[in-house]
Swiss-Prot record:
Family matches, as Pfam families: RHD3_GTPase, Sey1_3HB
Region (Disordered): 1-21, 840-862
Topology of the protein relative to the lipid bilayer: Multi-pass membrane protein
Topological domains, Lumenal: 766-768
Binding site for GTP: 63-70
Claim: Heme is one of the keywords in the record: no
Name of protein: Protein sey1
Similarity-based family: Belongs to the TRAFAC class dynamin-like GTPase superfamily. GB1/RHD3 GTPase family. RHD3 subfamily.
UniProt key word Signal: no
Length: 862
């Protein structure tokens, strides 16, 4: 039968099937050599006790050797412990064996029975070391200690195992009195065998109680417990069984009745000294349980036995704490496996995105993290809360710290990514909304756009942060991160507002430049309006369009800048810009407007431009009379006088244009007053792109006079020289035109003409037709000469004659091509080899009446 039990050396490294076979009838917990079986936990798992938690009970049986302890357990619990052969009187149970109750129908669940090696055996003789150690082990682990004695041994010291019970009492004082907060009680269940019935069970009970009380009073007790009673630490129960051999049927019946008592019960408060049973309902009271979870029983028992074997003082609370530490660590590692499976992929995904430089916002991270944490903590609580409360609380806190540190790092990185993504999305949303507003016509409220997008972005981040919140966990309150995010959005909003105001300033500056380009260009174009038709006299004061040009330029400039300031201020209000920001923007606008005006003026007075305007001004005065009619120069005209007056008048513009002066003050405009003082809100970045202005910026070193000087002295002199050369050319051209109209014919030619042509002259005068024809020709020639049409008429006549010749050539070519004889005589090629000649029309002739050259090339004249 022992072959069906797992001994200490069996089961290591065996398969589950072999373990099931080895554990069929139980396991040897301690062998005769005092070695502990580390396979106990496998046995508990195989019998499904390990998963029972606290729902199990442990019973140990004591008694003298060969008194039928194993037989009693086999009948009572259905176990199959080895029993002594009736033909041999030798030891059968060696060490401590354990088996699970097989008769579970009427008993409590998961009853574990330990069969302890009998005492007073001849095999060990005087060696009582194992006897004491096994008693200490059983008392430290068991709820109920069954003492198996025969009726005739009641009243005896050795026979009734009183020496063993004394050891039990001493061990109890050693173990449980150290832990005064938890006075663990034990039940001594006396099973009196071979009870004949002559002596009532109550009398036997009284005898045993008296003996036990006497033993209790004889043992030494700690200070303060000298007067303690045995009933303060032990409960007693009694049962009697008839003789197994002589009364087998009754023995079986009483054993079954005895088995019904191994259920949960409670204390009978109304019991008296004559009762043979002090417990009601069953022998398993809650205070008997050692409060060691079933899955930790093997480790706990091993620690207990190691302490016992090494003869160290056994401290059960310490052992329970050590067990709790071991099991809590083990459970923590187990529950973290599932936690790792859920969180590790997210950590890796986040790490990869961070390495790539694009932190990712993980979807459903809060839900996944909260569920993984809750599951991990709940599983730990379910399995570990059954152990020592102090250790459990500490280990749970350690587990929560460990998983919370991982979640915290993951969540913070997640919020950092959400933070960056939110800022980017906010900036892009504002930019897109501004672009949409500009495309819609430019009417958009920047402040409303920023506030709307900010509220939307904050709500998204808030939801993301709230999704990471774990109830009851302080660190998961990400309100500080929310406040930091809100603060950064405010900073981004301020930056975007500043950028938008900068863009607004750029748009206004462009508008100012555009308006200045038109207005200033118009004023400078008026410099050419010096002709008489405009009311400008040839002498005296300069026309109004010339002498007050700078007043009109400054007036137009002030008007444009004022309108620009109004536009800027109105738009800046829609940005909710502060007064300082508005003042800085206006200050920058005025400075840049003056620079734009100065650049436009410099463009107008560039050498090529100003020289052209001076020429136009001069030609208007020289080529046109007082009424604005073009002059036709004749030799009798005072060309020199007109030229001198027009030249001097135009040269008077050079000093006028060389300096920006107002006629009202005869001084430059007050740029210091125009620009204004530097506002308090100006930052260094606001001045980086500003051009220094002389007379305004003290550090520039230029004076207001230098700032308003348009043409330097060398430039003026060069301009005067170049203008005079140009004016001289115009004068020479006019003079040549006047002289070129006089034909130099010798006077004698007229006398010769009169003598030689007198007959013809008289004939014409006498012939009315010729006379009228002469009058018509003479009149037409005079009119054509007066209107300067002789040239065009001669050109038209030349073109007509040339066209006639071209048409004649074309007709001749057609004749030759169509006449076989002519073509043969001239050796012309066949007709199909000739190029097709296009017809002649007016649009194919040039100004001389000749055919224009085409891409096909001109035909050779015939």
């Amino acid at each position: 039968m022992n072959g069906h039990f797992a001994a200490v050396d069996n089961g290591n490294g065996s398969s589950p099937d072999s373990n099931a076979h080895s554990f069929e009838h139980g396991i040897q917990v301690i062998n005769e050599d005092k070695q502990y079986n580390t396979n106990l936990n496998e046995y508990l798992n195989e019998t499904h006790v390990a998963e029972a938690g606290f729902n199990y009970h442990l019973i140990s049986v004591f008694g003298s050797q060969s008194t039928g302890k194993s037989t009693l357990l086999n009948h009572l619990f259905g176990t199959q412990f080895s029993v002594m052969s009736e033909r041999e009187r030798r030891q059968t149970t060696k060490g401590i064996w354990m088996s699970k109750n097989k008769n579970e129908g009427k008993m409590a669940d998961n009853i574990l029975v330990m069969d302890v090696e009998g005492t007073d055996g001849r095999e060990r003789g005087e060696d009582q070391d194992f006897e004491r150690k096994s008693a200490l082990f059983a008392l430290a682990t068991s709820e109920v200690l069954i003492v198996n004695i025969w009726e005739h041994q009641v009243g005896l010291y050795q026979g009734a195992n009183m020496g063993l019970l004394k050891t039990v009492f001493e061990v109890n004082m050693q173990l449980f009195l150290k832990d005064k907060q938890n006075q663990t009680r034990s039940l001594l269940f006396f099973v009196i065998r071979d009870h004949i019935g002559v002596t009532p069970l109550a009398n036997l009970r009284n005898t045993l109680i008296q003996d036990l009380t006497h033993i209790w009073s004889s043992i030494s007790k700690p200070a303060g417990l000298e007067n303690s009673k045995i009933e303060d630490y032990f409960d007693f129960a009694f049962a009697a069984l008839p003789h197994k051999i002589l009364q087998p049927d009754k023995f079986i019946s009483e054993v079954q009745n005895l088995g019904s008592r191994f259920i949960a019960g409670h204390r009978n408060k109304d019991s008296d000294a004559t009762d043979d049973q002090e417990l009601t309902g069953g022998v398993f009271l809650p205070e008997y349980h050692r409060r060691i979870p079933a899955d930790g029983l093997s480790i706990y028992a091993e620690g207990i036995w190691d302490q016992i074997v090494s003869n160290k003082d056994l401290d059960l609370p310490t052992q329970q704490e050590l067990l709790a530490q071991f099991r809590c660590d083990e459970i923590a590692r187990e529950v973290q496996i599932a936690f790792d499976a859920a969180i590790a992929p997210l950590e890796e995904q986040q790490a990869e995105s961070t390495r790539a430089g694009k932190p990712a916002v993980l979807p459903n991270l809060g839900q996944i993290g909260a569920e993984a944490r809750e599951k991990c903590v709940k599983n730990f609580e379910t399995q570990a809360s059954r152990y020592h409360k102090g250790v459990y609380t500490t280990k749970r806190a350690e587990l929560e710290d460990k998983i919370d540190n991982r979640l915290k790092a993951l969540y913070q990185a997640h919020l950092t990514a959400a933070h960056k993504a939110g800022v980017t999305a906010f900036s892009e949303a504002v930019a897109n909304a501004v672009k949409a507003g500009q495309k819609a016509g430019g009417a958009y409220e920047f402040a409303e756009i920023v506030e709307k997008q900010k509220t939307k972005t904050l709500e998204i981040f808030k939801k993301e942060a709230q999704s990471l919140a774990i109830p009851g966990v302080a660190w998961s309150n990400f309100k500080p991160q929310y406040l930091i995010f809100e603060k950064e959005l405010d900073e981004v909003s301020a930056r975007l507002r500043k950028e938008e105001m900068r863009r607004l300033a750029i748009r206004v500056e462009r508008w100012v430049k555009s308006r200045l380009g038109d207005a200033i260009g118009l004023e400078f174009n008026k410099l050419g309006s010096g002709r008489g038709g405009s009311g400008a006299p040839e002498s005296g004061e300069k026309p109004a369009t010339e002498k007050d040009i700078w007043d009109r330029v400054w007036k137009a400039f002030i008007s444009i800048v004022g309108e620009a300031e109004s536009r800027f201020t109105d738009r800046a209000k829609s940005f909710e810009a502060s007064d300082d920001e508005v003042q800085v923007g206006l200050w920058r606008l005025r400075r840049k407007s003056w620079v734009a005006l100065r650049e436009k003026i410099e463009e107008e007075v560039m050498e090529s431009n100003i020289l052209m305007k001076l020429r136009e001004n001069f030609e208007d005065k020289f080529r046109y009379d007082e009424d604005g009619v073009p002059r036709i120069w004749r030799p009798s005209d005072d060309i020199e006088g007109i030229y001198t007056r027009a030249r001097e008048s135009t040269l008077g513009l050079v000093p006028l244009l060389s300096r920006f002066r107002l006629t009202s003050t005869s001084a430059p405009p007050d740029l210091i007053e125009f620009v204004g003082p530097q506002p308090h809100g100006v930052e260094p970045g606001d001045e980086e792109d500003l051009t220094p202005i002389g007379g305004v910026d003290e550090d520039e070193g230029k004076s207001l006079e230098e700032e308003t000087t348009i043409l330097s002295e060398p430039k003026k002199q060069d301009l005067v020289v170049r203008f005079k050369k140009m004016a001289d050319g115009v004068y020479v051209e006019a003079k040549r035109s006047a002289i070129g109209g006089i034909t130099q014919v010798p006077l004698y030619f007229y006398a010769v003409l009169l003598v030689l042509g007198w007959n013809e002259f008289v004939m014409v005068l006498r012939n009315p037709i010729l006379f009228l024809l002469l009058l018509l020709i003479s009149g037409g020639t005079y009119v054509a000469y007066s209107l300067n049409l002789l040239g065009p008429m001669m050109q038209m006549a030349n073109a007509a004659s040339t066209q006639g010749m071209e048409i004649g050539k074309a007709k001749l070519r057609d004749f030759l091509e169509n006449h076989e004889g002519a073509r043969g005589a001239l050796g012309m090629p066949p007709k199909n080899a000739q190029r097709v000649e296009s017809g002649i029309s007016m649009d194919t002739l040039d100004s001389n009446g000749k055919r224009k050259e085409t891409g096909l090339g001109a035909e050779d004249d015939i």
